[in-house]
UniProtKB/Swiss-Prot annotation:
Its main location: membrane. It is found in: Membrane. The chain crosses the membrane at residues 632-652. One of its GO terms (cellular component) is extracellular matrix. Residues 525-617 form the Fibronectin type-III domain. Residues 691-716 are annotated as: Disordered. Residues 26-72 form the LRRNT domain. This is Leucine-rich repeat neuronal protein 1. The keyword Glycoprotein applies. Disulfide bonds join C447-C499. It is a single-pass type I membrane protein. The lineage of its organism: Eukaryota, Metazoa, Chordata, Craniata, Vertebrata. LRR repeats lie at residues 73-95, 96-117, 120-141, 144-165, 168-189, 192-213, 216-237, 240-261, 264-285, 313-335, 338-359.
Amino acid sequence: MARMSFVIAACQLVLGLLMTSLTESSIQNSECPQLCVCEIRPWFTPQSTYREATTVDCNDLRLTRIPSNLSSDTQVLLLQSNNIAKTVDELQQLFNLTELDFSQNNFTNIKEVGLANLTQLTTLHLEENQITEMTDYCLQDLSNLQELYINHNQISTISAHAFAGLKNLLRLHLNSNKLKVIDSRWFDSTPNLEILMIGENPVIGILDMNFKPLANLRSLVLAGMYLTDIPGNALVGLDSLESLSFYDNKLVKVPQLALQKVPNLKFLDLNKNPIHKIQEGDFKNMLRLKELGINNMGELVSVDRYALDNLPELTKLEATNNPKLSYIHRLAFRSVPALESLMLNNNALNAIYQKTVESLPNLREISIHSNPLRCDCVIHWINSNKTNIRFMEPLSMFCAMPPEYKGHQVKEVLIQDSSEQCLPMISHDSFPNRLNVDIGTTVFLDCRAMAEPEPEIYWVTPIGNKITVETLSDKYKLSSEGTLEISNIQIEDSGRYTCVAQNVQGADTRVATIKVNGTLLDGTQVLKIYVKQTESHSILVSWKVNSNVMTSNLKWSSATMKIDNPHITYTARVPVDVHEYNLTHLQPSTDYEVCLTVSNIHQQTQKSCVNVTTKNAAFAVDISDQETSTALAAVMGSMFAVISLASIAVYFAKRFKRKNYHHSLKKYMQKTSSIPLNELYPPLINLWEGDSEKDKDGSADTKPTQVDTSRSYYMW
């Protein structure tokens, strides 16, 4: 009985093969166009169901028109890589056609394809033609169309109802065209669309509610569109979306608000975007997210505290090939219980904290090879790893520092080094060494450092102010992460900003030099003198520290101020603990150079000067005019001397009186004179001295005094 069944089955198989052979022979010999291949081939439906279909393959034959003797039984017609630009009625008899491939031809208009009456067509390939627009209802006869590939064309315009009639469309490829806008009305006719690829179009931007009609969309690709921002409501309505790609755009931050509107997202691709940092809340409460890619980001420098928060289903994170990624906060992950694979290779990481790994209870594998690892206490846990975590490519894990261990394998070094505390190290690429910003903008400087124990981070401004997280200022704000925010930056805010990371082991510093509108205040000067107010007889000056050292330790041993103009030069010793002086008894409308010279306890000298002109005074007495008047009076007296002896007597009397009145100006009129001012003014000016006196006292010991910017002194 079994043998009989076997014989029957064998006969059926032979009969089937014979019928297939006869069918193929019939198609090939009597109804197959010349040079084409006609046969039964495997075919998969858009739902990936396997079938066999009568196929006519006329690919790459340089045809200029469709062959005329096609069988009406044809189900798949392949005409890829030909030179066809227009059809007549060759397709009208192909009632059973389910797939049509016109890719890589010369069509410029969809109407010229001749798609009328192809009611059974499910897949249409029109990619790599020269189509420039899609007009209203251009595909309305394709009621069963499920896949439309019209990518890599020249389409710049799509009418609002271009996809009318395509209610069964599941997959739409519009990528690599010339679209500048995305119109949500396109999708009103495609409610069942599941896959949309619209990347590599020069769109001006994504708009709110752009994809709202696509409630059944499962995959959206927005790659290579030069997008710089994603509005908060751009993804509203995509309740079924599972896969989203922003690959190769210009996003500078994670579009966290938009991502919160996609509740069922499982796969997110943010690769190759210039995102600077992943910060708190960027990936939060994404309850279905399983895989996240943040690879190949040329500007990514840090993953901050709580950057990944409450992601209960995340199993894989890839953050590789980021050349500036040098810092991952020890608390970067919070409530990420399912993470199994953590890929961090080929970055600029010096270390990864043990606490970071311990916060991931289900972690199975980690990759940190091909990073410039610092082999000290921060990664000492690797050698004492007692978990089941597998390090991928451990033989590619080498020390980059300290210098004596450079090039050694990590595990080899950590066996020798068991220290539990180590110096802070500021991440090299966390902020730029130099930058030029526009006046009035807000500037952010991100300073990140790793050490055990965790370091305190603060900043020192160009004028020596220390900025901490407790600092209250309208100009500066420091986050707990170490980011300095400078609001409404002005030219006077330019200079060298120093980040200091400090713990019990010591400190590390790094400097950023900021230009404002291309201008940089002289950063080589430790101090700079400014004119705050000018009057006819006085000048109010102040000075500021402009140093890249910590000014809390900056001490001056002496300070000297010099006032100079063509008629007078004098010098004064001033107290070292003040920043403001009022210079009085000056002449109106006169040019002066005011210089401040300070010396520190190491006898290093710094000098800053400013030129200033006093204001005009209507009733000010001009000395040169007085001198001219005096000479004229003498001449007139001589002329009238012969007239009256009495007049001569009066003249000499007045002359004698004026001489007594101006006795104190004789020295003042000497251009090269340098006088001690205590001859002219009250005893308060005994703080001052002439140039000669300054030289005598220059070597005197002066107790260093810490600079106090709150005091103001007056010179009379």
